[in-house]
Amino acid sequence: MNAIRELLSFGSVVVVATCLTSIAVQAQKSSGSSALSGTSWQLVKFQGPDERIFSPDDKSKYTITFGSNGRVTIRVDCNRGSSTWKATAKGELQFGSWSRTTAKCGARSLHDQVVTEGAAVRNFVIKDGHLFLSGMAAGGYYELEPVASGKR
């Protein structure tokens, strides 16, 4: 009888531990836990599929912040947007549907290039402290640097 109680007690502990582990793993996945989690970046340059390079006149007008809660916010010149994000250890990056403002930006704006190509980003890598976003079908990539503390 004691052996049965001990076996049942042990079985209950295993079930509870398994459930808690599963909950912790799901929470980690949904919070966007990765090297990007809790980071903010500003655009250094965009190289288009035709290998032309575009650099912003003001890096602080082109920023992206990956929240640790699975949300992402962007500033693309005179517009702002938000979505959800997920990343894998293999460097795959996925965004949900974007909601954003649609103001008409100035003549020297990179808004149209960033919005058009940015929607197709599928991969990321952090190299030498810079974030590189790529994976667009037509080619090209974004290079971003960390936003200095206090400038988000």
Model-predicted regions and their roles:
Residues I4-F10, C19-R152:
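Lipid interaction determinants
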Residues V14-V15:
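Repetitive helical segments and hydrophobic/amphipathic motifs
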